[in-house]
Amino acid sequence: MTWHPHANRLKTFLLLVGMSAMIVFFGALFGRTALILAVLFAVGMNVYVYFNSDKLALRAMHAQPVSELQAPAMYRIVRELAASAHQPMPRLYISDTAAPNAFATGRNPRNAAVCCTTGILALLNERELRAVLGHELSHVYNRDILISCIAGALASVITALANMAMWAGMFGGKRDGQNPFALLLVSLLGPIAATVVRMAVSRSREYQADESGAVLTGDPLALASALRKISGGVQLAPLPPEPQLASQAHLMIANPFRAGERIGSLFSTHPPIEDRIRRLEQMARG
């Protein structure tokens, strides 16, 4: 079984560089003061998210902590995988919902939490559950919460500067010698471009977690089988498309909403399931 993590890492790095380049461009329009204010706002907001990501996600899913007596298989699998990776044991939670999904959150391995829904526990066999938990632990070990917050901070800066461009275009463009139509165009396209790049970062991290999770468990075909089941299960029992749940959808192992409720692929937080399965099957073939 071969694993090529560097391609996804390079892609993530280049996407973050691209977002930084957008910020430099916007900063050139408004000068240093506006750029500093936007950066301070975005960093402050995302620092809060970084340190509270576990609480926000667990609360949104109404997740409850479980003991080893309540979830013996889940505890045994996670303990074995954590020991294999030489990492601490995370806190385990279960969300009482029929929607088949799982997620991990927490800013580092010592503050990590892993949550499974009752739907996914009922749907998967133990081999598939092990593969899913390996995927989720890989998100923690790869520091994906930190990467997500960096991408979020950069996107927030771009959005804040784009809003400034909009107001400048409407009220101050001609007076300041700037083209108001150009400013309004930038204000419209900037947030869209930032969102597209941010979602691309999220999709890149999903591929990375698929690969590193498959290496951790040594069983890429089990993860492929689990993803196939989860994809079908979501169509039967999706999460309700509520804003609080939508804000946490990027943490899930698969898009938790029914196909008709998804937005375009450029704005999706997850790669197509079929593509993920194909990559895992290629890994298994070596």
Curated annotation (Swiss-Prot):
The active site is at E136. PROSITE patterns: ZINC_PROTEASE (PS00142). Zn(2+) binds at H135, H139, E206. InterPro entries: HtpX_protease, Pept_M48_protease_HtpX, Peptidase_M48. Binds 1 zinc ion per subunit. Its EC number is 3.4.24.-. The chain crosses the membrane at residues 13-30, 34-51, 145-165, 181-201. One of its GO terms (molecular function) is zinc ion binding. Keywords: Cell membrane, Hydrolase, Membrane, Metal-binding, Metalloprotease, Protease, Transmembrane, Transmembrane helix, Zinc. One of its GO terms (biological process) is proteolysis. One of its GO terms (cellular component) is plasma membrane. It comes from the Bacteria. Pfam families: Peptidase_M48. It is a multi-pass membrane protein. It is found in: Cell membrane. Its cofactor is Zn(2+). HAMAP family: Pept_M48_protease_HtpX. Belongs to the peptidase M48B family. PANTHER family: PROTEASE HTPX. This is Protease HtpX homolog. It comes from Mycobacterium ulcerans (strain Agy99).
